[in-house]
């Protein structure tokens, strides 16, 4: 795939793999395929069966897991067969489809990560507005657009590739295609994703440093001098954080399967959002203190949850880049120096990228309590049924 001599003589590859090499390689790739399918099916089941994971944004993870499953079932087995046999024996039509699917699923994975990053960014910068708009239907539309973008990028192999000749299945090696496909499938989405994530990190860092309500000091200071905002010296009741609606944390309500009883949510407001004087009774001071304590503790919990989510997102993005960057870098390099990259190294990077499809379920298990609990429930149920 790197040098013209090697590409045009695919039958030579059969001499490279003896039975002692082909058998362990087949077992290793076979186990990798099973791990990818098992782990990602587990993710899909967990999202649809666990109340803690039914938040609309987790549909992104379902679609991402589906892309990884498709890689394991429609791409990797044929890549393994082509590698071991040193020739393509599945026909010219399937060769074209296979190459397009390979690009499609890889591109879909990184565009999903871009969408997840943007979703997280909007949920932080436009908390109330975006959380109200973040419905399953809206997320499904975004996922559909993600797949359309990936499909558009993966179409050129079907149109411009050199048709498979004999037992060779290889993509178009024209410089313009290599460069454009690498930019569209990896480098551009990767840059967007990293920039968005850096912005997310900066915002999360600022909010972690500021105690509740500090980001609204100026607004509150202005309102204290406004006679319309006071009633007999009593300041109007306002939520202390834009992530709350009637005392309910938007993200907490969407990601937790426990109902939280909050005294702050029991406050009644007039049509203009002002607290009525007749509603203030003796003993309300204790309730106010309890309300403030509840809000402060919930604020700390929300900050910890944002940190964890941001960290998990960083790990997923980082692992994806680590797995696929070597391949795309060397593949782009071949456009300018066809024989400068050793074929063995290129093949290693090629298969190393596929390993990424098995890692997301492991990341969720290690860093996300909800997924870990859901996986345990799913697996324990199966064990109990076997015992019975």
Curated annotation (Swiss-Prot):
- The UniProt site entry described as Implicated in catechol agonist binding and receptor activation is assigned to 181, 185
Residues in coiled coil: none
Q: What is this protein called?
A: Alpha-2A adrenergic receptor
Question: Which positions does the site annotation Implicated in ligand binding cover?
Answer: 102
- Biased composition (Basic and acidic residues) is annotated at 212-231
The family database entries (PANTHER family) matched by this protein are listed as: ADRENERGIC RECEPTOR-RELATED G-PROTEIN COUPLED RECEPTOR, ALPHA-2A ADRENERGIC RECEPTOR
* GO MF, one example: epinephrine binding
Cellular compartment(s)? Cell membrane
Bilayer topology reads: Multi-pass membrane protein
Q: Which residues lie on this side of the membrane: Extracellular?
A: 1-22, 86-95, 163-173, 338-344
């Amino acid at each position: 795939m790197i040098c013209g001599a090697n590409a045009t003589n695919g039958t030579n590859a059969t001499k490279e793999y003896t039975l002692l090499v082909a058998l362990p390689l087949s077992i290793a790739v076979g186990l990798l395929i099973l791990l990818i399918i098992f782990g990602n099916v587990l993710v899909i089941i967990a999202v649809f069966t666990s109340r803690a994971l039914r938040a609309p944004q987790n549909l992104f993870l379902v679609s991402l897991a589906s892309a990884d499953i498709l890689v394991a079932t429609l791409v990797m087995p044929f890549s393994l067969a082509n590698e071991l046999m040193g020739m393509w024996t599945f026909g010219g039509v399937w060769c074209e489809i296979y190459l397009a699917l390979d690009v499609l699923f890889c591109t879909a994975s990184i565009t999903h990560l871009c969408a997840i990053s943007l979703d997280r960014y909007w949920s932080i910068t436009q908390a109330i507005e975006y959380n109200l708009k973040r419905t399953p239907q809206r997320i499904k539309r975004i996922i559909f657009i993600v797949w359309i973008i990936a499909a558009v990028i993966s179409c050129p192999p079907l149109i411009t590739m050199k048709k498979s000749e004999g037992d060779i299945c290889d993509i178009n090696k024209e410089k313009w295609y290599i460069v454009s496909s690498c930019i569209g499938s990896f480098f551009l989405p990767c840059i967007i994703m990293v920039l968005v994530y850096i912005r997310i990190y900066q915002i999360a860092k600022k909010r972690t440093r500021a105690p509740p309500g500090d980001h609204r000091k100026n607004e509150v200071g202005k309102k204290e001098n406004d006679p319309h905002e006071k009633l007999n010296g009593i300041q109007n009741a306002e939520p202390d954080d834009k992530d709350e609606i009637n005392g309910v944390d938007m993200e907490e309500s969407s990601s937790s399967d426990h109902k939280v009883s909050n005294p702050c949510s029991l406050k009644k407001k007039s049509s203009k959002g002002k607290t009525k004087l007749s509603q203030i009774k003796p003993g309300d001071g204790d309730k106010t203190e309890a309300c403030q304590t509840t809000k402060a503790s919930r604020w700390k919990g929300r900050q910890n949850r944002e940190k964890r989510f941001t960290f998990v997102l960083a790990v997923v993005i980082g692992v994806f880049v680590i797995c696929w960057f070597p391949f795309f870098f060397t593949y782009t390099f071949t456009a300018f120096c066809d024989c400068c990259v050793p074929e063995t190294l290129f093949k290693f990077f090629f298969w190393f990228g596929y390993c990424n499809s098995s890692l997301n379920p492991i990341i969720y298990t290690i860093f996300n309590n909800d997924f870990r609990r859901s996986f345990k429930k799913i697996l324990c149920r199966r064990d109990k049924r076997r015992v019975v």
